[in-house]
């Protein structure tokens, strides 16, 4: 499922087997269009629409989607891609859920500092983003079936972690001073 013919970015799919339950599940890696602005947000919507339609057609419905979504907020008017991923629709088989239920106004909000993944630096070099840790661009979403209590394959509470982030670097570089997550 890697090729998206509409000129958008590819999505990588792995089909895996959960050894304990025998459940076959799909894992997807994404890197959606970067940068702010309506044209970039519209491309993210196009990319997530293709993904959601693909997930709606899965059977059975066990999946994990992770990667750099580059989504700046959950505001449907400025970032309709987030709604495409997480909102209820006529077909909810492909609806995605945040297993830690930390959806809200994460941009530049210290209450979300433990899940921020961008930007790990405050100065610009090599073409990358700067500004310090103040956005949640990297996510792991799961299908409803993985969250169900009676499911043969379940999310294990407390295992979601923004790797390298100790929650103490809001608007700072991730390596500014001590970092209790990696040291």
Question: For each of these PLM feature ranges, what is it?
Answer:
Residues 1-33:
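Structured beta-strand-rich core segments of catalytic domains in phosphoester-bond hydrolases
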Residues 11, 45-48, 52, 82, ...:
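Extracytoplasmic/secreted envelope proteins and their assembly/folding machinery
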């Amino acid at each position: 499922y890697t090729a998206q013919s509409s000129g958008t970015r590819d999505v990588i799919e792995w089909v895996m087997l959960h050894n304990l339950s025998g459940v076959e599940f799909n894992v997807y890696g994404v890197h959606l269009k970067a940068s702010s602005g309506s044209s970039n947000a519209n491309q993210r919507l196009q990319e997530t629409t293709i993904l959601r339609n693909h997930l709606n057609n899965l059977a059975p419905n066990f999946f994990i989607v992770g990667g750099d979504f580059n989504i700046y907020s959950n505001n449907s008017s400025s970032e309709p891609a987030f709604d495409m991923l997480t909102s209820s629709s006529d077909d909810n088989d492909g609806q995605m859920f945040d297993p830690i239920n930390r959806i809200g106004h994460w941009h530049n909000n210290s209450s979300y500092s433990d899940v921020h993944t961008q930007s790990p630096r405050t100065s610009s070099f090599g073409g990358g983003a700067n500004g310090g840790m103040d956005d949640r661009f990297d996510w792991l979403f799961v299908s409803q079936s993985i969250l169900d209590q009676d499911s043969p394959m379940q999310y294990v509470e407390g295992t979601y972690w923004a790797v390298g982030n100790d929650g103490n670097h809001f608007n700072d570089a991730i390596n500014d001073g001590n970092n209790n997550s990696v040291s």
